[in-house]
C-alpha cells in the first residue's frame, strides 16, 4: 500500500491509495516532533505501507525542506520514500471545501481534514508522475 503525507508544524495530513482510489485518512495532530514521528511510524506499520510519498515545496523554501527532511529521518520506516512537489496542494485542497460554510471551513482547517485533502493532492501527483511510467 502507498501512503502520502503533508508535513506541517501543527498537523500531518495523511492519504492512502486503496485499490487505485486516493482516500484521505485522519490527520496526525502534532504536539512535538518525536510524538508525531512515532504516530506516523505506527501508522506505516499498522497499514503495512511499502511506499511513503512526502510533499515538499520547491527549493526556494529551504527552511521548510530541511524541516521536512529532518522529520522524515525521525520516522521508523524501511520502505521506499518518495518526495513530490507539494506546491499549491493546500490551495487545491481548500478549493475542495467550497461546499462548506465559513465556520466549517475553519473547523476543517483546524481538525486536519484540509491537511489530509492536501495529502490526497500530493498522492494524486505521485500517481500521475510515477505510477504512469510503470
From Swiss-Prot:
The keyword Nuclease applies. Pfam families: RuvX (PF03652). It is found in: Cytoplasm. The keyword Cytoplasm applies. GO terms for biological process: rRNA 5'-end processing. Could be a nuclease involved in processing of the 5'-end of pre-16S rRNA. This is Putative pre-16S rRNA nuclease. The lineage of its organism: Bacteria, Pseudomonadati, Campylobacterota, Epsilonproteobacteria, Campylobacterales.
